[in-house]
Each structure stands twice: as C-alpha cells, then as structure tokens.
A protein has these predicted regions:
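Outer-membrane beta-barrel pore proteins
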Residues: 1-4, 15-19, 109
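Solvent-exposed loop/turn segments connecting transmembrane beta-strands
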Residues: 2, 255-260
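Surface-exposed loop/interface segments of Gram-negative outer-membrane beta-barrel transport/assembly proteins
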Residues: 9, 13-98, 114-230, 256
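Extended, hydrophobic alpha-helical segments in both membrane/secreted and soluble proteins
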Residues: 10-12, 117, 159-161, 229-235, ...
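Residue-level signature of outer-membrane beta-barrel architecture
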Residues: 12, 16-17, 28, 103-107, ...
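Short coil turns and loop connectors of transmembrane beta-barrels in diderm outer membranes
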Residues: 20, 109-111, 170-172, 241, ...
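Glycine-rich, phosphate-binding/catalytic loops in enzymes
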Residues: 134-135, 263-265
Length: 267
C-alpha cells in the first residue's frame, strides 16, 4: 500500500533550415521519476504459514508470530504497513536528460559536398534512501533502526564530425564519407549507512546524527572516467545501379585499454 511509482517525461525536437545551405536541429528527452516503498517486500507474508494465528486473545494483532521454538516472523498486514509509513520507507529519485544537437552545411562551390556535426549531451542522476525504524520487520523489538543513502551520477558527451561527398555522373555514382568522433563518460557513486538513528523523523536525511555505527563502504563508492576516439573513411562507387565497389577503414582508440594498445584499425 505504501509502494508507488511516478514518472514525468518531456520530449521535444525541431529541425530548421536557414537558406539553401544550412540546417540545424535538436532532439531532447527528459524524464524525472520517483519510486517509493521498494524496501517493503511481501515475501514474509507469502512465506507465512496459512495456519498461523496473528491475533492476540483480545483481537489485536501480535507483533510477531512464532511457529515453533525456532521459526518466528514479523506480522505484516496492510494496516501494519500503512501505520509504519513514516517509520519503514524508501525513496529513489531519478532524473535524466538526453540531448542530440546537429548542424549541417552544404558547400555552395562544390556540388554534393557537405559537413555535419552531431553533438550528444546526456546526464543521469539517481538518489535513493531507505529507513527502517527500531524493531520494525524484526522479531526483536529493540533491533536498532537503520538508514542508508546513496547517489550516482553519469555524464556523457559525444562529438561526431562527418564530411560527405555524394555525386552522380551519368551512370556513375560516387559517395565518399570521412568521420572523426570522440566521446567521454564519467560515472560517480557514493553510499553511506547508519544504525541507531536517534529520532524517527530524521529518517535517512540526517545519517550523520546516528548514535550507532556509521558505515562508509569503499566497495560502494566509485569513480569511472572513460573515453573513445574514432576515425573512419569510406569510398563507395556504383555503376548503373547494378555494380558496386566499396572500401572502408576505421580506427578506434579506447582509454579502457592498456597504454600502447589503445588504437585498433579495422579495414
């Protein structure tokens, strides 16, 4: 009952010509979403014995149900989950914007020759937190409260330059393309957790006030930066729309590869 997902999206584009030789445009896709209650699982309810009695003699709900000397589980009902809405919760916010821009110009002095640049700018951010109050979802009433907070961010840019020559001479058609592109991606992630939060209204917003252990696990912190660079050339000749010859060469370099072995060429 306390789980929900909300998403807002915005998309727009335009393609505008200026005179006979210049054209530019943009495509944008932006979204924002919120996910709540993902830490509240139903497995405990599904796994509970159908003959278990979750009620006390006076009709009130028990805190836990014990099947035998070893098996005991926290009682979960819709009412319990709703009552604990501010004491047992999680929230994840995601924002992303993806943008592609281009500009194209034709050479007025050379028929069939044009230059185009494509630019991609992307950003993605995710921020999430969870909080479980004292004794909640635990067979022990004094189990310390816990909270965690994490954040990740990804930025990416791509630039692609294309020079194209495309002409038809009678039955002969010639298409020549040269391309240079580069891109870079940066990813960061951070995470912190705490035990024994002094006040439930702190939830996961003030983990620094935790009276118990504050955990900063280095395995949950990350920074990555990578890049890719490419060159490409292609020549294609067609005769009478029946016969075609094509030659292509491409070279890529990746920062993820070892120095001295970053460039690879593909004929």
């Amino acid at each position: 009952p306390t789980q929900n997902y909300t998403r807002y999206s915005l998309r727009g584009s335009f393609d505008q010509g200026v005179g006979k030789y210049f054209r530019f445009g943009l495509v944008n896709n932006t979204n924002y979403n919120v996910t709540k209650g993902s830490n509240i699982g139903l497995y405990g309810v599904l796994a509970m014995s159908p003959i278990a009695n979750p009620y006390n003699a006076d009709g009130t709900l028990k805190r836990t149900v014990k099947y035998n000397s070893q098996d005991e589980s926290f009682v979960l009902t819709r009412g319990v989950v709703e009552e604990l809405e501010d004491s047992w919760l999680s929230k994840t916010e995601g924002f992303g914007t993806y943008n592609n821009l281009f500009a194209e110009v034709k050479c007025p002095w050379v028929e069939g020759l044009k230059y185009r640049v494509n630019l991609g700018l992307n950003y993605r951010s995710t921020k999430g937190g969870s909080f479980t109050g004292e004794g909640i979802n635990s067979t022990t009433a004094d189990t310390p409260s816990t909270a965690s907070l994490n954040h990740s961010e990804t930025t990416n840019w791509t630039v692609e330059n294309l020079l194209t020559y495309d002409r038809t001479f009678g039955k002969h058609q010639l298409n020549v393309v040269g391309m240079y592109s580069a891109e870079q991606t940066v990813y960061t992630r951070s995470d912190v957790a705490g035990r024994d939060i002094p006040a439930e209204y702190f939830q996961f917003y003030n983990i620094g006030r935790a009276e118990g252990t504050i955990t900063v696990n280095p395995d949950n912190w990350n920074y990555q930066k990578s890049g890719l660079m490419s060159w490409m050339g292609r020549v294609m000749y067609t005769y009478d729309n029946r016969y075609m010859l094509m030659a292509t060469v491409r070279a890529d370099a990746s920062s993820r590869l070892a120095k001295g072995h970053q460039w690879h060429t593909y004929p």
